[in-house]
Amino acid sequence: MTEKNTTIQNVRAVTRALAILNSFAGKNLQSLAEVTLGTGLDKGTTRRLLLTLMDSGFIMQDPATQHYRLGRAIRDLAANVADDLDLKAIALPVMTELAADLHITAFISVYDEGDTVCLDRIHDMKGIEVHWWAIGGTLPYNCGGAPKLLLAYQPPQEITRVLKRPMVAMTPKSVMDVTEFRDQLEKIRRRGWECAVDDVALGLTALAVPVLDRNGDVVCCISMAGLTPQMVSRGRPVHLARLQAAAEQIERRLKQ
């Protein structure tokens, strides 16, 4: 095979791979048949290219449904386009207002390969200092509202991978049983929020909700923390509606 022919084949492969990635525009999950239909490629070529893209992290596959979705490599590249999507700049004013109104500590956090990273926090708990989660810091995946919520929204294979890591007991209330924790994650995903009581620090409760993009994927988590009597009443989170409204406000701004 000549060098010219090799170059042509390589260009064709790249073009086809890009067609597969572009077929996910506006779509969260696709079957093999849907990708084939969307690209006009034959099934064998589509399958081979999907496997190659999976190896590179550009595509992920749900083992339960065998459907495909965009992978973390796409999100990592997108994260570098700061001018197009400055998440912190959009979310911070909303969370600052929330913290000032309710006198709580508000957090903006993102998922990163099994860790939940605090992008920013706004502290307005009068007379009370909170130091457990610094900006840029992480929390154990089994403790706190944001870590559990963000993990609950990950694909099943990612949850399984993370659960191979040791759990950490920050307080006696921290969940340390894998089966119990899996059940907790399923419940969080179904209801769309998490209220974590006393599992990071005794006497403190965190409430967390997701911020979703137009495809229903999690962009970040916004959460608030305060004294348990301030956050929970009769077993229910007091400020859930307010936090969900803040998430919806951020979602609208992200879509503009």
Can you describe what each PLM-predicted range is?
Residues 65-165:
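Amphipathic alpha-helical effector-binding/dimerization core
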Residues 151, 158-163, 169, 247-256:
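Cysteine/selenocysteine-centered motifs that mediate thiol-based redox chemistry or coordinate metal-sulfur cofactors
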